[in-house]
């Protein structure tokens, strides 16, 4: 009986570590989607301010651009995927730092279920995706599918 409980706890810890890794990969996919969107906006149809666009592209190419990114914050029950923006207003206490600006989604630490946020602290009621389903997991980890603005999280 005790041996079974130990094995069960080991499996739970393994599942949690996979969910954490998938949540981080999911955040990277959303960040890549934003990067692709930003580059597309700068290059596609001719930017209304070409000097600004060229300056932005040069910063991206030399690695000094501070683009919006998505990061995972660990909570008691959920991983919170947070949109972080670089603060450029010099009156802010976060000047020249990334700061969390909004919640993109929640990922259940136990199951890998993905939720749209209802508020900063709480997910919406209905599960939108499940990382235990291989098809849905592959969908979430592909940057072409996950929109940085979160449109894919609305009920289908």
What do these predicted regions represent?
Residues 3-71:
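Negatively charged, low-complexity tracts enriched in Asp/Glu with abundant Ser/Thr
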Residues 11, 49, 66, 78, ...:
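Polar low-complexity intrinsically disordered regions enriched in Ser/Thr and small residues
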Residues 58-105:
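Exposed beta-strand-loop-beta-strand "reactive/processing" segments of non-cytosolic proteins
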Residues 111-143:
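A short, surface-exposed interaction/processing loop segment used at functional sites
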Residues 145-156:
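Cysteine/selenocysteine-centered motifs that mediate thiol-based redox chemistry or coordinate metal-sulfur cofactors
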């Amino acid at each position: 009986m005790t041996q079974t409980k130990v094995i069960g706890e080991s499996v739970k810890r393994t599942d949690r570590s996979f969910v954490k890794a998938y949540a981080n990969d999911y955040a990277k996919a959303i960040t890549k989607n934003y990067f692709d969107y930003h580059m597309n906006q700068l290059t596609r149809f001719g930017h209304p301010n070409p000097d600004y666009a060229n300056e932005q592209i040069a910063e991206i190419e030399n690695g000094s651009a501070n683009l919006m990114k998505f990061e995972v914050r660990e909570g008691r029950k959920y991983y919170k995927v947070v949109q972080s923006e670089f603060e450029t207003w010099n009156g802010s206490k976060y000047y020249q730092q990334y700061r969390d600006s909004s919640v993109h989604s929640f990922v259940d630490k136990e199951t890998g279920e993905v939720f749209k946020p209802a508020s900063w602290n709480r997910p919406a009621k209905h599960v939108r995706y499940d990382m235990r389903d291989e098809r849905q997991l592959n969908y979430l980890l592909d940057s072409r599918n996950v929109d940085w603005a979160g449109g894919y999280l609305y009920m289908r």
